[in-house]
């Protein structure tokens, strides 16, 4: 993952440079655990992301007081966008017929918890962790028993296991983006656009009125 590169940058920091450990912020948000590990995708809950942005803004203002007003203004504007996004999700997913979302891997736990959905991941928290035949059979049984009609793949993850479950159950495939990086394949140019595209995909896939 990205951690070795992050560790290298931290090691190169000079005494004049301040390093903010994001884990001190995200840890306070409450980690989502599963048997497969810890879900680090806290930003998929817009309220978590807002808390993170505010904490980072406060730190930047303290180390660069000359530009504190700019930091505060930018933070306030982005947090307002995140509040609106949270409202759109809460409203848009309130009436979904299906409350079980089957995903390529367990990246959407924060989103599911925030909006009253149950996430079932084909792979674990690490998308490179390949599911066994037993795992695939268990997910397929959940798809059938829960009446799931849509299985979500991801822009940066090989969809072959999702395709296997879909072909055995008759479910269709749709794309959800965990916003791990913006690429040409992303359904938007920034976090807000990608999250709005995710909401549209969820409303269709979860059969929301």
Task: Indicate where each model-derived feature is located.
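Extracytoplasmic metal-acquisition and chelation regions
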Residues: 1-209
């Amino acid at each position: 993952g990205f951690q070795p590169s992050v560790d290298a940058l931290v090691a190169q920091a000079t005494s004049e440079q301040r390093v903010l450990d994001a884990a001190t912020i995200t840890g306070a948000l409450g980690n989502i655990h599963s048997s497969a590990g810890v879900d680090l995708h806290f930003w998929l809950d817009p309220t978590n992301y807002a808390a993170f942005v505010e904490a980072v803004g406060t730190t930047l203002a303290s180390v660069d007081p000359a530009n504190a007003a700019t930091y505060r203004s930018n933070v306030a504007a982005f947090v307002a966008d995140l509040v609106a996004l949270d409202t759109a999700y809460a409203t848009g997913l309130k009436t979904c017929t299906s409350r079980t979302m089957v995903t390529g891997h367990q990246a959407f736990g924060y989103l599911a918890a925030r909006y009253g959905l149950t996430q079932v991941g084909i792979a674990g928290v690490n998308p490179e962790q390949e599911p066994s035949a037993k795992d695939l059979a268990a997910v397929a049984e959940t798809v059938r028993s829960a009446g799931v009609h849509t299985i979500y793949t991801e822009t940066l993850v090989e969809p072959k296991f999702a395709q296997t479950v879909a072909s055995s159950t008759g479910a269709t495939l749709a794309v959800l983006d965990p916003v791990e990086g913006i690429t040409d394949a992303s359904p938007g140019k920034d976090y807000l656009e990608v999250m709005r595209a995710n909401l549209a995909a969820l409303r269709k896939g979860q059969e929301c009125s």
